[in-house]
């Protein structure tokens, strides 16, 4: 708790420092600085403010497309539009009217760029009717043209009001001139055209209609507003005031308000980011502290580093099992004891599974529960060390005699009874199957693989799970659908019942298939129950059993059928199962017929929680 409190204090301190910095951050420049940056553009007879900028008037003082250039020493003003330079002959600030002429037409016509230059319709509008004239050049010298001219490089040309000569000339471009300057005849005199082009065009800036008043600065001087473009729905310039004469080089500025709003919003965003990071880091710290506390509670259980794990397994040379969570290797401790080492896959998602398994196994001490000897928890490297059992897993020994299978089934029942009732905290295994039952040298069973186990208090009869866990064919119905009942320790009882029935059914699988070849893939508890009703156990048990073996086999069948009842409330608890297995056959009542329309499943296929084992030795 002290570390968490310290972290909270550090977070609060950082938050206060951040607020202090934002509070003292200069929001806007001084009035003198604003006047210096946005003083009017002056060149020759032209003095303008917004929306123009250029020279010593900064770019953010006007529209980005309206940059003016002062050409010295002639003190003439130019404006670049769509890549072509225009001479600005005059600007009327009150009416927002400009007189523009193409600079390349200011000299001899033959020196022009001979390209069309339509003005941008989003910035300008024509004030009077205009007409486009077509200039053809590089024409056929053998033909006669109206309004013809000759340029040294361009060759023979013609200026007309239509496209008459388009097929007779290689090149053409258009120029725009006022209609009043165009004569009635079709062809134009080149000298007359040069004069018209030098006089230029009159255009009006596209400013919104909200005008008619002067803006006033805080010191009472009349001037221009810098942030004139507001609420622009399209590309047009939109102003809240008219472009009027500028006095004293100052202007009214709403920038302080905008910058203040931006600063406040930025501060809020930064604070939110800081709080999120603090919360995230705090959650990670708490989770890590909880894991460490959980592992520290393991007491005398020895921890190993990853280097020691490699040495124990001789660099992971001998694989004895594979599973969904990791790989099991054979190893040997320094004292000579053989061990099995399960190395979990590098994954962020299996930390909880690792903690579950280590915590569950560390609480157990029973002859029918595999013994945990140590663990490794080094960053993303995690491993579990437990006793090595020579005879591997039960799925490789299902053909044993009935007496041995009965002893194994009873041992598994005692192990599960211990997990449910003998530990300080109840442990529900959730993955009972032949691959997770290991056999020692005396064929004594030991329940293994606690990767899906869940710990709960004994008074908790109902468990909450967010996923389906276990192996298909052994998973209790309530884990698939809550319509069958609540998930509890009775889910292990169902898996145990399927395990016991498989031990009996697998022993004579070939005989069953030969007896009914058309139904060999049927859900095997179905035909077990039918044989039980008909008092015919021949195809299941076979011949040559002693009376004691036959009693034990029938007892296993009855107990198994009791355990696989679909409703958890109809299943016996594990301590009752042990009592039934140890008692006499005559004391067992026939079980109700279970729901027998379970779809055919592959018993080796697993749910998303696990992958198929491919070994003679199951992972623990």
Curated annotation (Swiss-Prot):
SMART domains: S_TKc
Gene3D superfamilies: Phosphorylase Kinase, domain 1, Transferase(Phosphotransferase) domain 1
List of glycosylated residues: 75, 85, 93, 132, 148, 162, 189, 231, 248
Keywords linked to the UniProt accession: ATP-binding, Glycoprotein, Kinase, Membrane, Nucleotide-binding, Receptor, Serine/threonine-protein kinase, Signal, Transferase, Transmembrane, Transmembrane helix
Binding positions (ATP): 320-328, 342
Localization of this protein: Membrane
GO-annotated cellular components: membrane
Sample GO molecular function, one term: protein serine kinase activity
Enzymatic reactions: L-seryl-[protein] + ATP = O-phospho-L-seryl-[protein] + ADP + H(+); L-threonyl-[protein] + ATP = O-phospho-L-threonyl-[protein] + ADP + H(+)
Official protein name in the record: LEAF RUST 10 DISEASE-RESISTANCE LOCUS RECEPTOR-LIKE PROTEIN KINASE-like 2.3
Originating organism: Arabidopsis thaliana
């Amino acid at each position: 708790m002290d570390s968490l409190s310290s972290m909270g204090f550090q977070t609060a301190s950082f938050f206060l420092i951040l607020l202090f910095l934002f509070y003292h951050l200069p929001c806007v420049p001084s009035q003198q600085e604003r006047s210096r940056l946005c003083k009017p553009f002056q060149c020759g007879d032209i003095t303008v403010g917004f929306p123009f900028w250029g020279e010593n008037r900064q770019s953010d003082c006007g529209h980005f497309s309206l940059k003016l250039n002062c050409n010295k020493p002639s003190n003439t003003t130019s404006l670049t539009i769509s890549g072509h330079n225009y001479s600005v002959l005059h600007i009327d600030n009150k009416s927002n009217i400009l007189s523009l002429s193409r600079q390349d037409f200011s000299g001899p016509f033959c020196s022009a760029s001979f390209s069309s230059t339509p003005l941008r319709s989003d910035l300008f509008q024509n004030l009077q009717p205009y007409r486009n004239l077509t200039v053809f050049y590089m024409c056929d010298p053998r033909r006669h043209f109206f309004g013809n001219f000759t340029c040294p490089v361009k060759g023979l040309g013609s200026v007309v009001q239509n496209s008459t000569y388009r097929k007779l000339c290689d090149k053409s471009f258009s120029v725009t001139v006022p209609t009043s300057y165009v004569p009635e005849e079709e062809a134009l005199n080149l000298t007359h055209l040069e004069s018209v082009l030098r006089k230029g065009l009159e255009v009006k800036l596209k400013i919104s209609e909200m005008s008619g008043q002067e803006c006033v600065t805080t010191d009472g001087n009349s001037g221009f507003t810098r942030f004139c473009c507001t609420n622009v729905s399209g590309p047009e310039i939109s102003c809240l005031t008219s472009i009027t004469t500028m006095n004293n080089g100052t202007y009214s500025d709403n920038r302080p308000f905008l910058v203040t709003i931006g600063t406040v919003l930025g501060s809020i965003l930064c604070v939110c980011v800081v709080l999120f990071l603090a919360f995230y880091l705090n959650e990670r710290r708490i989770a890590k502290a909880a894991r460490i506390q959980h592992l520290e509670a393991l007491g005398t259980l020895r921890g190993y580093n990853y280097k020691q794990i490699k040495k124990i397994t001789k660099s992971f040379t001998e694989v004895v099992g594979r599973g969904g969570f990791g790989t099991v290797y054979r190893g040997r401790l320094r004292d000579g004891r053989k061990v099995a080492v399960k190395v979990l896959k590098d994954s962020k998602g299996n930390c909880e599974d690792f903690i579950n398994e280590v915590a569950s196994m560390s609480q157990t001490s029973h002859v029918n529960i595999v013994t945990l000897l140590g663990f490794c928890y080094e960053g993303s490297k995690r491993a579990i060390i437990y006793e090595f059992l020579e005879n591997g897993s039960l799925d490789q020994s299902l053909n044993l005699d009935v007496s041995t299978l009965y002893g194994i089934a009873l041992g598994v029942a005692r192990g599960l009874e211990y997990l449910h009732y003998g530990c300080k905290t109840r442990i529900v295994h959730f993955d009972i199957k032949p691959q997770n039952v290991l056999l020692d040298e005396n064929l004594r069973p030991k329940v293994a693989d606690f990767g899906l186990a869940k710990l709960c208090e004994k008074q908790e009869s109902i468990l909450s799970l967010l996923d389906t866990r276990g192996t298909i064919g052994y998973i209790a119905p309530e884990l698939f659908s809550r319509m069958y009942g609540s998930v509890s320790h009775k889910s292990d009882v169902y898996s145990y019942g399927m395990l016991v029935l498989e031990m009996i059914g697998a022993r004579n699988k070939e005989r069953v298939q030969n007896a009914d070849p058309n139904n060999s893939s049927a859900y095997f508890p179905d035909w077990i129950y039918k044989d039980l009703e008909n008092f015919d156990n021949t195809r299941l048990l076979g011949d040559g059993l002693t009376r004691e073996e036959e009693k034990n086999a029938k007892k296993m069948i009855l107990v198994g059928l009791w355990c696989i009842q679909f409703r958890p409330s109809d299943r016996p608890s594990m301590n009752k199962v042990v009592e039934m297995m140890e008692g006499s056959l005559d004391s067992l009542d026939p079980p109700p017929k279970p729901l027998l329309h379970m779809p055919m499943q592959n018993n080796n296929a697993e749910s998303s929680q696990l992958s198929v084992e491919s070994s003679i030795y199951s992972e623990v």
